[in-house]
């Protein structure tokens, strides 16, 4: 049982931000606010969502992309973070798992995810 003040605050935080519906296996493009000195810019990070955990305001998700020289880069974000400017779903993946941690050991074509056909 949560405190009603905390619950009302969390509901207000959730209501402020429009977040698209996505799940593990979807390819996302994230707009991340980067503070450099007194300037703020938006850096895009494009990768596959490999896990979603938690609920409500505490919900986080992890994205993975292959960087330069086939080095995997994973970033975990709170879903309702102020540093996330935008979340865009580029592709909907067809997977049978909620956590795609097995992609960490795959390289190249083996790490591909099939696209969901409608």
Curated annotation (Swiss-Prot):
GO BP term (any one): translation
Gene3D superfamilies linked:
2.30.30.790
Task: Look up keyword Ribonucleoprotein and say if it applies.
Answer: yes
The record's Pfam families line, in alphabetical order, gives: Ribosomal_L19
The protein's superkingdom reads: Bacteria
- Keyword Ribonucleoprotein assigned to the entry: answer is yes
MF terms (GO), sorted A to Z? structural constituent of ribosome
Q: Which UniProt keywords apply?
A: Ribonucleoprotein, Ribosomal protein
Single GO cellular component term: cytosolic large ribosomal subunit
- Job description of the protein: This protein is located at the 30S-50S ribosomal subunit interface and may play a role in the structure and function of the aminoacyl-tRNA binding site.
Family membership noted in the UniProt record: Belongs to the bacterial ribosomal protein bL19 family.
Return the NCBIfam families for the record: rplS_bact
Q: What is this protein called?
A: Large ribosomal subunit protein bL19
What species is given as this protein's source? Helicobacter hepaticus (strain ATCC 51449 / 3B1)
């Amino acid at each position: 049982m949560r405190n009603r003040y905390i619950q009302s605050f969390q509901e207000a935080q959730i209501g402020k931000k429009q977040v698209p519906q996505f799940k593990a296996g979807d390819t996302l493009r994230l707009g991340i606010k980067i503070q450099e000195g007194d300037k703020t810019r938006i850096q895009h990070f494009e990768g596959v969502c490999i896990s979603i955990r938690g609920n409500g305001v505490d919900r986080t998700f992890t994205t993975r992309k292959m960087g330069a020289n086939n080095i995997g880069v994973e970033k975990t974000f709170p879903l309702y973070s102020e540093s996330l400017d935008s979340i865009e779903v580029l592709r909907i993946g067809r997977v049978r798992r909620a956590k795609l941690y097995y992609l960490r050991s795959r390289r190249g074509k083996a790490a591909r995810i099939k696209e969901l056909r409608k």
